[in-house]
């Protein structure tokens, strides 16, 4: 006799910690009206500035989305490593900020704390608003199991022959929207802006007929500048929606995604705006293609082509001339897939040869005046 069991298993998400532990740090905590600020001795000054920034942007973000976290948000300021980033753990209601300003080749210059705290808190608020079952239930599995009819007398069931498992996510927000609205922040925000770096990346995709499709914008894990293109495309599309249909549409879409049976961004946009996500994307695509082609057409009349010095790899950055002027050092990810997998190379112009100096170099090189040392 076949026996079938259907059940729901509530799942918890376990994230591995990739950063090193630092037991030598002496941690402190203080409270503001809406945040718990955590810092170690070396980041006290940054933490106090961060507290001021966080309270200043709190009403702007929460009023924009019409949502407030259920309790004080944890804001952790740390600076133990030669690293910079920000992260929002929206189920934990926690933000981690590395104190050192981020110097990223694909972004322009922005005020670090104001930018990163607003960006990450926008994640906290917008993604918590989109949750289907709150922060305590991140998801579920619908499962069904069947067993062989034959079984041992001392065993309750036969050997399992069927296992069907269907995940039901508690949050269903595509990356382009999550990152797009976090960069948009709120109306008239100027901590993060559409800078020339972002414009260059999107413009290059448009004029070379290489725009990310609506589906391609829904994932990370791309090579080269593909992941950054998800950020840029999401920022541009979110801004387009806000300009064409009102910025309240962004908040309303997040609210629509919180509906228990709403798992489609295409349908969620349709329910809010009255047009499908595919149609909105097509309008957006046509709009920016017309814009960039109009700007580029005059340049095409008398094009000026430079000489390509390096063609291998998707990242070739920070070239520095040798004091002699006959060679240069640069960073490249040749042989690797991702933008940040760079190594230091030395190129001899006369010989036309490259030499790898050191793997895993991420900052711009500098020559000693004698030309014998490089930092």
Pin down the residues of each PLM region.
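Bacterial Sec-dependent N-terminal signal peptides
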Residues: 1-23
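Residue-level recognition of alpha-helix boundary/capping or hinge positions
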Residues: 15-21, 29-31, 35-38, 59, ...
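Juxtacatalytic substrate-recognition/specificity segment
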Residues: 17-168
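Acidic/His/Gly-enriched intrinsically disordered linker/tail segments
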Residues: 22-23, 92-94, 112-116, 124, ...
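Surface-exposed helix-capping loop/turn segments at secondary-structure junctions
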Residues: 63-70, 243, 247-250, 307-308
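Conserved beta-propeller blade repeats
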Residues: 107, 114, 313-328, 353-374
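A flexible loop/linker signature enriched in serine peptidases of the S9 family
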Residues: 192-195, 311-316, 331-344, 358-362
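Multi-bladed beta-propeller domains
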Residues: 291-315, 345-363
């Amino acid at each position: 006799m076949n026996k079938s069991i259907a059940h729901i298993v509530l799942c918890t998400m376990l994230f591995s910690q990739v950063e090193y532990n630092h037991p030598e740090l002496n941690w402190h905590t203080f409270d503001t009206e809406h945040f718990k600020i955590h810092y170690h001795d070396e980041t006290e000054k940054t933490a106090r500035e961060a507290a001021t920034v966080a309270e200043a942007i709190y009403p702007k973000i929460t009023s924009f989305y019409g949502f407030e976290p259920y309790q004080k948000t944890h804001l952790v300021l740390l600076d133990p490593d030669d690293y910079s980033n920000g992260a929002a753990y929206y189920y934990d209601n926690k933000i981690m900020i590395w104190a050192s300003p981020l110097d990223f080749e694909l972004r322009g210059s922005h005020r670090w704390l104001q930018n990163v705290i607003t960006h990450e808190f926008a994640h906290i608020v917008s993604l918590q608003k989109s949750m289907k079952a709150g922060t305590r239930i991140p998801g579920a599995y619908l499962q069904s199991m069947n067993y062989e009819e034959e079984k041992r007398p001392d065993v309750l069931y036969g050997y399992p022959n069927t296992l069907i498992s269907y995940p039901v996510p508690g949050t269903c927000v595509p990356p382009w929207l999550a990152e797009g609205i976090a960069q948009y922040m709120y109306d008239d925000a100027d901590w993060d802006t559409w800078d020339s770096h972002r414009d260059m990346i999107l413009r290059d995709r448009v004029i070379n007929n290489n725009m990310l499709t609506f589906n391609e914008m829904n994932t990370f894990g791309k090579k080269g500048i593909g992941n950054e293109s998800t950020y840029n495309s999401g920022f541009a599309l979110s801004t387009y929606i806000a300009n064409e249909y009102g910025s309240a549409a962004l908040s309303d879409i997040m609210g629509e995604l919180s509906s228990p049976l709403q798992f489609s961004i295409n349908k969620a946009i349709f329910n809010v705006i009255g047009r499908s996500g595919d149609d909105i994307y097509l309008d957006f695509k046509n709009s920016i293609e017309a814009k960039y082609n109009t700007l580029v057409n005059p340049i095409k009349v008398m094009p000026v082509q430079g000489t390509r010095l390096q063609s291998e790899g998707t990242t070739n950055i920070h070239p520095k001339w040798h004091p002699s002027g006959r060679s240069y050092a640069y960073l490249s990810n040749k042989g690797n897939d991702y933008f940040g997998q760079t190594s230091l190379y030395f190129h001899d112009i006369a010989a036309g040869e490259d030499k790898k100096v050191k793997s895993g170099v991420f900052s711009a090189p500098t020559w000693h005046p004698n030309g014998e040392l490089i930092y």
